[in-house]
Amino acid sequence: MVETIRFIPFDKIIFYENYKGDRLETLINNMGDKKILINPPVAVQIQSNQYLILRGKYRAMALSKLRCMNITAQIVDEQCIKISSWLHQLPKNNELIMRFQENRDFYFSEKKLAHHKYMVKMYIEDKIYYLYNDIKGDIGEVIPLLNSIMEKYDKNYKYKKIIKEEYTSNSNYITLEFPKFSMQEIITLVNKGMLFPENIVRYIFNVEMLQNLMIPINVIRSPEAFEFEWREILDKLLKSV
């Protein structure tokens, strides 16, 4: 596991999803006060000099804001990654349901359409509905549609993020299930300058993840000057495995 930890130049990393400024600011202040990074972000190498951050985007961004030219990251092999999606569950609200049904940004259907990828599978009581991007199926239309869907409830209604295995039918809730995207689809969208809304894509790692690893910010900021301290951190990690 030690060999999976690397220093990566911040200008060599890219992100796949958007972020909230207030949450980032809170983390910057917290990390700045404690002067510690708890657990490095997780990334996958997608080109010889480019890495996609899969988990820990706020930590990666905060390190940059704290004057770190490089970030520490746990690098995982693409073969060890399974891509799924999150479900959003929120209290049933008839006004919200009408917003979905009457919105012209997408096609609302009670039937699953053959050869078309739905953008949301919606569970309302014992019925299932599907939202499509106007039947076109263009990958470039995915992000605007997902943003349009989440704008209907993200700020005004509190939702709970759950996994598929946790879902049970409940007449008091609306549950939205997002589709799965391949790594290639995600990279294609990112290369077009598009970012997913938060809490859509879910990564499952079939590899041991670093837990409770604490790295001083000054070591990350100046690894050459603190080479001895960095070696101590790696030695402790190696002994704990």
Where are the regions that the model predicts?
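Helix N-cap/beta->alpha junction signal
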Residues: R55-G56, P179
